[in-house]
Regions:
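Conserved helix/coil segment N-terminal to the catalytic DExD/H
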Residues: 84-103, 108-127, 141
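Walker B catalytic acidic pair
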Residues: 134-136
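Hydrophobic anchor at the beta1->P-loop junction of P-loop NTPases
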Residues: 19, 49, 163
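Conserved nucleic-acid-binding Ia/Ib motif block in the N-terminal RecA-like helicase ATPase lobe
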Residues: 55-103
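Conserved Walker A/P-loop ATP-binding site and its immediately adjacent core
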Residues: 28-30, 43-66, 169-174
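Conserved pre-motif I regulatory segment
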Residues: 1-21
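Conserved P-loop NTPase motor "coupling/switch" region that bridges the ATPase
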Residues: 46, 66-67, 72-77, 81, ...
Length: 204
């Protein structure tokens, strides 16, 4: 569709980009196409997809198998909280040398845990990675441990993307952490509190 092509043309080579597209407009396909373009041009060889619990499995069973071009060899693993030997073997394949795109899909809650953070850090240190947050309002609370952890991880991601149809759920301050994930300089404020002091009138 034309709107998807427009979004892809504007975003594909940017280090950071927000897909603020309404539900049903195909933003997931745009992101996967963007990932494929960066891989084909040698810009990335890894992807860390962070999604809410309700849709994280869909990325693994439907979105990536449907939209990732068939010519791209890939190793795709869905993170599990309880790591069995089989799961560990799958995770280990993400670090094997060779060609191909390495993709890990993680529930956003996993990045509240030491186990999830340690793995994500290792993955980012070993790959040129696109890190994408599906339903990015899941990181709107700057005090939440998962938000702080994800903002830390973002520093090591070569490309960063966020996606949501509703970037503001309660008030405009919801935007701070989402934009900070993309690039701290987008808002000209490196602190949530200085951002709030500049733009918000707090009521008691």
């Amino acid at each position: 569709y034309a709107h998807q092509m427009t979004a892809l043309e504007k975003s594909w080579n940017k280090e950071s980009y927000a897909y603020f597209m309404e539900m049903g407009t195909g933003k997931t396909k745009v992101l996967i196409d963007n990932l494929a373009m960066l891989y084909d041009r040698g810009k990335v060889n890894g992807a860390l997809i962070v999604a809410p619990k309700g849709v994280v499995g869909t990325w693994y069973t439907n979105e990536l198998p449907t939209h990732l071009p068939s010519h791209i060899e890939n190793v795709t693993v869905l993170w599990q909280a309880n790591i069995t030997k089989k799961q560990q073997d799958s995770l280990d394949t993400l670090f094997e040398e060779g060609e191909g795109l390495h993709i890990i899909i993680m529930n956003v809650e996993a990045l509240s845990t030491d186990k999830g953070m340690n793995f994500a850090n290792k993955f980012l240190s070993c790959h040129r990675t696109m890190m994408a947050i599906d339903e990015s309002t899941t990181i709107k609370n700057p005090q939440a441990s998962r938000t702080r952890n994800i903002l830390t991880l973002a520093r090591d991601a070569k490309y960063r993307r966020i996606m949501t149809g509703s970037p503001v759920t309660k008030n405009p301050l919801d935007l701070f952490s989402q934009c900070y994930f993309l690039d701290p300089f987008h808002l000209n404020h490196e602190s949530y509190y200085s951002f709030r002091m500049r733009y918000a009138i707090m009521k008691t």
